[in-house]
């Protein structure tokens, strides 16, 4: 499929700190891409670079084949960017903020009115459009920013935390809208809410320290972990001697001790019984076995160097 966005060796620095480290990848037209990762992984900076609101220190970003670094104004007409925090003009109403951006892009007044009505209705925002941005709730401000960035009908929508500051109902209506737009538009978003990511993605990028360390569909990413199980055994008294004995079992992977509980991974359930055999005679309080999930992909040790 045709790419909406292509990155070639994109780098971003802050003093001597690397924020983005030579990123190269493409994003297919009409796809919904989720970006996840720990704090300070570079997620928000990547969105700003993709939107053209920040220029990379090196490398190139192409929007529908246009080099953003050389023809920034041309390429930005294809994108809408919703940052995490509100950047609305506090002296204007929510509707005035939206209309102003529409006029900047040369959208006809009739189309602005039509789109405001459509998207504000979808987001249950109509009754709040007359309020000054300075007194709007953070959730309604976020909705207004989404409407504002859709007002010029961009082919690419980039959002930092789509449902930040929203209640459950508002979050649900926001995702309903975004899922309807998927396919028609390329949607790229950052979210710390893994349940949201699990419900809305064609592809997931996992970032760590400015790099993409995992990239694929959720099914493909989880396939790499499904051969593993995570085990927990809580003892009445897990001594260092006992922990070291259990950790020494050759089939145990990445054992950790938290209080009186040992956490470890293994490729097969048989590992569990090997550990229980080594712990024979010790008093136990609780046992658990589970498959790895998307949340485990965010564990820096697992994602960064695997379980082996």
Model-based region annotation:
Residues 36-38:
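The feature captures the beta-strand-to-loop junction immediately N-terminal to the Walker
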Residues 51:
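Helix-to-loop junction immediately C-terminal to a conserved catalytic motif
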Residues 157-161, 166:
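Catalytic Walker B motif of ABC-type/P-loop ATPase nucleotide-binding domains
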